[in-house]
């Protein structure tokens, strides 16, 4: 399972969609679960859905995961890798303003300020790379993790 997390507007959903497309093109079954909601109940529901997904292929979960308790809940599910997607606050605010389902700007500020960084297996700064490059990096990491599940465990790959 791959959890793509970060503040609103960082690019998580765009990147997760690109990753799903790349893997699907390669014949890998992919389940993508997404939520923009910030409630504990939502994360419990996401965890239940992700845990019940078939074990073949890749399960992608896209959400802020800005609270450590939500990260811990997902880590308890087993073989889970966290990809932390970051961007500057200015970038997150601008992207939020330009998307169809923008959240309240105050919400972006709160999540950005209160975001508890996960012990990420891969970190991507979307101020430094585009979604296509970010997706390529994640797919490469997924392939590495599949070949050697212990690889880079607990140590972030900064790309």
Describe each PLM feature range.
Residues 1:
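Walker A (P-loop) ATP-phosphate-binding motif of ABC ATPase nucleotide-binding domains
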Residues 78-96, 124:
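Conserved phosphate-donor/acceptor-positioning beta-strand/loop module used by diverse small-molecule
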Residues 70-74:
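A short acidic, amphipathic alpha-helical/loop segment
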Residues 98-159:
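Small-molecule kinase domains that catalyze NTP-dependent phosphoryl transfer to phosphate-bearing small molecules
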Residues 7:
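P-loop (Walker A) phosphate-binding loop of NTP-binding proteins
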Residues 55-62, 81:
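Loop/turn-to-beta-strand initiation segments
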Residues 4:
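Hydrophobic anchor at the beta1->P-loop junction of P-loop NTPases
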Residues 10-57:
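Conserved substrate/cofactor phosphate-moiety recognition/catalytic segment
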């Amino acid at each position: 399972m791959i959890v793509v997390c970060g503040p609103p507007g960082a690019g998580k959903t765009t990147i997760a969609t690109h990753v799903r497309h790349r893997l699907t093109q390669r014949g890998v079954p992919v389940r993508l679960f997404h939520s923009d909601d910030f409630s504990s109940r939502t994360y419990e529901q996401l965890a239940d859905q992700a845990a019940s997904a078939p074990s073949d292929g890749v399960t992608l979960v896209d959400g802020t995961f800005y609270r450590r308790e939500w990260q811990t809940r997902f880590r308890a599910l087993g073989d889970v890798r966290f990809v932390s997607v970051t961007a500057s606050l200015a970038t997150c605010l601008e992207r939020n303003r330009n998307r169809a389902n923008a959240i309240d700007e105050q919400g972006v500020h709160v999540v950005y300020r209160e975001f508890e960084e996960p012990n990420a297996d891969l970190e991507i700064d979307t101020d430094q790379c585009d979604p296509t490059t970010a997706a390529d990096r994640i797919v490469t990491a997924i392939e590495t993790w599949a070949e050697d599940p212990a690889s880079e465990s607990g140590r972030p790959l900064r790309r």
